[in-house]
């Protein structure tokens, strides 16, 4: 499995020293990173850092305003650093109007990004499994976005919402191009990959159209770097 790390997982470390943190991610063995901020570096500096550490950019998590207000700038930055995706990590989807606004923004940005061979995506939490007009909000998003817009499915949050991640991955098939590998236990806590209830091997097998598997870890019962290393080792042995 080609394993990358969502850098938000180590945000307390990147706040101290962004470059050294990224270097440590590479030293552990991760193949790529997904950004949630750039440590005040320019696009050229980020590109140089990736080259120095032999990492690639899966993509970036950018707020919805980056799609609606500053997408040309967002796209240019991600083109420079070699991103494959630009992902919206959260949006309000409690009403049909909010979903429509999100879908329109993603479709418009996706069409523009496609000209640079970059795709746009949406990353779920649990609130997208609210029922809106008799359907899950995430289903409405998936149904109404075009082929330039994909799902980055966070399996922790799918399970947290009471949905089987494997069945949900199969439901959307080709739409699911990225998986957030994030483990959950019986108490709905985020734990090391090896210590939870989700079978990541079966999830990988179900996600037959997914190219990128991105570790995200937000709750820690041990030093951060120990957990990040544990996750990599568990997945690399898969």
Residues covered by each model-derived region:
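Structural preference for beta-strand elements that scaffold enzyme active sites
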Residues: 2-4, 32-34, 56-61, 84-85, ...
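Acidic/glycine-enriched edge-of-secondary-structure segments
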Residues: 53-66, 184-185, 189-192
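Short histidine/acidic/glycine/proline-rich micro-motifs that form metal-
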Residues: 9-12, 37-40, 62-66, 91-96, ...
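Active-site-adjacent beta->alpha loops and helix N-cap segments on the catalytic face
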Residues: 39-49, 96-105
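A short acidic, amphipathic alpha-helical/loop segment
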Residues: 45-49, 73-74, 164-171
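Active-site acidic/histidine proton-transfer and metal-coordination neighborhood
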Residues: 64-150, 158
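Short acidic, glycine/proline-enriched helix-loop-strand junctions
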Residues: 42-61, 109, 116-118
């Amino acid at each position: 499995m080609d394993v990358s790390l969502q850098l938000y997982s180590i945000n307390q470390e990147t706040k101290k020293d962004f470059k050294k943190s990224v270097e440590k991610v590479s030293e552990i063995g991760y193949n790529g990173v997904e950004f949630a901020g750039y440590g005040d570096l320019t696009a050229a500096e980020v590109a140089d850092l990736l080259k120095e550490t032999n990492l690639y950019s899966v993509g970036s998590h950018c707020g919805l305003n980056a799609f609606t207000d500053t997408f040309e700038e967002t796209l240019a930055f991600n083109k420079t650093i070699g991103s494959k995706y630009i992902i919206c990590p959260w949006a309000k989807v409690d009403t049909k109007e909010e979903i429509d606004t999100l879908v329109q923004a993603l479709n418009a940005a996706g069409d523009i990004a496609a000209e640079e061979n970059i795709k746009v995506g949406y990353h779920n939490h649990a609130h997208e499994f609210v029922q809106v007009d008799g359907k899950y909000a995430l289903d409405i998003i998936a149904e109404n976005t075009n082929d330039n817009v994909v799902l980055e499915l966070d399996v922790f949050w799918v399970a947290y919402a009471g949905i089987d991640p494997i069945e949900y991955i199969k439901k959307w098939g080709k739409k699911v191009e990225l998986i957030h590998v994030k483990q959950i236990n019986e108490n709905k806590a985020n734990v090391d990959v090896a210590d939870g209830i989700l079978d990541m091997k079966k999830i990988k097998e179900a996600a037959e159209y997914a190219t990128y598997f991105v570790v995200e870890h937000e709750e820690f019962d041990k030093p951060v770097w120990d957990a990040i290393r544990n996750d990599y080792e568990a997945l690399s042995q898969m």
